[in-house]
Structure formats: C-alpha cells, structure tokens
Amino acid sequence: TLFACEQAGITPDFLLLGKGLTGGYLPLSVCLTTDDVYQAFYAEYSTQKAFLHSHSYTGNPLACAAANATLDIFRDDDVLNRNRQLAAHMAQATAHFSDHAHVAEVRQRGMILAIEMVRDKNTRAPYQWQERRGLAVYRHGLANEALLRPLGDVVYFMPPYTITETEIDQLARVA
C-alpha cells in the first residue's frame, strides 16, 4: 500500500504528504481530508464559514510537474508490487540478525526495516546510552559505503525505491 494507515486499517481525518511527492527536491505538500471534514467548512462566502489554509508551496508548477511524473511512474512501473518483492528480499537478507546475541528484534513494515540492538537478548536489557551503539553502526556503515540510520540503538534500513537486490545485500553485509 502507499500509506501505513492502510496497512493498519485506519482512516485518518487528515493525511499530509510532502517529501514523497517530489523526492524532497522541490517544495510541494498536500493536505487531504475526508468529505465530512471538507463539508464542515464548505459554505457560501456570506456565511463566513471557511477553513482558510494556504502555504508558501502553493501552485509551484515545477513541483506539480514532478509530482505528476512521480504518480505516472507509480502507475506505469508497478512500483508497489516491485516494493513488495524488494521488501521480501530485505527480510531474507537480514534474517540472520535475529540470531545475533545482541539483537532483540528485527521488525519490518514494507520498505522500512529496523534492527534493535540490546546488551542482553534474553532480558532485552539495553546498552547504556553513553555507548552509542547506533552511532557506531552508522559510522561503520559510512566507512563501508552504506547509509544506515540509527535512532538510539535501533538501526533502520529505509532505502529508496530504486534500490537493487544487490544493494540490499550490501546493506545487510555492512550492518
């Protein structure tokens, strides 16, 4: 699916989109809402019932063209199906981490995968924050041409959709 809320079976009142529309290269964002919310603010001007919302990214023609091109790629190249295949490959390539003595959990949702490191797997006792294990993995990754994202002692794989299976294997080897 395109959105995590779909996987969770949640229908939000508002859905905000930004970087994914243009890859973050051009300023564009979208605020989507339900018909119920829209209708609560829609009326004749004379009623002065309105939800006035605007921003500095409104109507940028280059950004809109980039977003339309992105939507075309998603439609024409079957990106979601390809991502399912890549996500399955990423799960397979990182499965060995589950057996590591200092990995509490490998968890994944689509193309985002997290490896949680702990001092003791059995008790899930964390490392002392001063040890900065996530930072050590990040630095090791950079030294080996891999960009991994640590959040504390959890290392995230958040690859671009253009990644190849060979590149996923490289990330798994380096991590």
Label each residue range with its predicted role.
Residues 1-175:
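Conserved N-terminal phosphate-binding loop of PLP-dependent enzymes in the Aspartate aminotransferase
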